[in-house]
């Protein structure tokens, strides 16, 4: 009888785990595949489809102190490593057209070398980089630790005057070339046709990303959202809380959602049923 009860309890626990590890996105079922565990607070995720490699920053303990490091994860081989050469690395972005991986550190912009698994400061700015977003047309957008917006293009770094009146923690460019930015007050849109800033709502945005078609998304601690630029609405695709709170997100080469939580990097893979 005791064995039967234990068996039933085990089945119940397994069922609960299966439910927890399955999510429904736009009416489709997805399972959670852990790509990397024991990786603390992976942040600022970006993906290089040519090399099937994910880039991010993460927190680590060194001599009882918390430090920021940059890392890479090959999604095919699950090979993980620390990127050397970046001072207090925080931000990542990928130029898929020219095959350049950009990394942001405390003292400027770096590029990644696959051969040496290291990064080199390209010497265009000494600003402390917080976040990056690459746009094929307009260049490398980035924000600084004091929440100011900039763009790097054609060898020049310029402050984005249109968005500089408000603090900018993270930013991105939409399908229609409008600039989206977020701070502690929420998410905003700078419409380049009207030169007006539009309040899109009180969302705690920690990262922007886009899929292979250029559609814009963002993550927050409580979920992952699609940005509907036509009606300026935010469509919540994933809800998470507690230890599963989302730190950042990206898309792989097949447009599967990859995101990080407190201690893992997870990919959503199609599943028949939850």
UniProtKB/Swiss-Prot annotation:
Signal peptide positions (record): 1-18
Keyword Glycoprotein in record: yes
Gene3D superfamilies attached to this UniProt entry: YVTN repeat-like/Quinoprotein amine dehydrogenase
Keywords annotated in UniProt: Glycoprotein, Signal
Free-text tissue specificity from the UniProt record: Present in larval hemolymph and synthesized by the fat body.
Glycosylation sites: 183
Coiled-coil annotated residue ranges, if any: none
InterPro entries, A to Z: WD40/YVTN_repeat-like_dom_sf (IPR015943)
Function: Binds to an ommochrome, ommatin D which is a yellow chromophore. May be involved in guiding the chromophore through the hemolymph from the epidermis to the gut.
Subunit: Monomer.
The name this protein goes by in its record: Ommochrome-binding protein
Lineage: Eukaryota, Metazoa, Ecdysozoa, Arthropoda, Hexapoda
């Amino acid at each position: 009888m005791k064995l039967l009860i234990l068996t039933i309890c085990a089945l119940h626990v397994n069922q609960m785990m299966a439910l927890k590890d399955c999510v429904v996105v736009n009416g489709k079922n997805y399972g959670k595949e852990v790509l990397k565990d024991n990786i603390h607070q992976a942040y600022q995720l970006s993906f290089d489809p040519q090399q099937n490699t994910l880039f991010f920053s993460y927190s680590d303990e060194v001599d009882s102190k918390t430090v920021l490091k940059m890392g890479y994860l090959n999604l095919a081989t699950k090979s993980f490593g620390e990127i050397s050469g970046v001072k207090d690395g925080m931000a990542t972005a990928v130029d898929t057209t020219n095959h350049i991986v950009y990394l942001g550190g405390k003292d400027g912009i770096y590029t990644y070398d696959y051969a040496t698994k290291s990064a080199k400061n390209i010497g265009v700015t000494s600003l402390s980089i917080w976040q990056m977003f690459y746009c094929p047309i307009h260049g490398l957008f980035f924000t600084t630790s004091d929440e100011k917006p900039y763009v790097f293009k054609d060898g020049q770094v310029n402050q984005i005057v249109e968005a500089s009146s408000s603090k900018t923690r993270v930013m991105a460019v939409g399908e229609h070339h409008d600039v989206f930015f977020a701070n502690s007050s929420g998410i905003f849109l700078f419409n380049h046709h009207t030169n007006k800033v539009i309040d899109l709502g009180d969302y705690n945005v920690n990262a922007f990303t886009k899929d292979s078609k250029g559609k814009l998304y963002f993550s927050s601690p409580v979920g992952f959202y699609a940005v509907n630029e036509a009606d300026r609405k935010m469509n919540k695709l994933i809800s998470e809380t507690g230890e599963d709170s989302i730190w950042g997100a990206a898309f792989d080469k097949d447009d599967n959602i990859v995101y990080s939580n407190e201690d893992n990097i997870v990919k959503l893979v199609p599943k028949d049923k939850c």
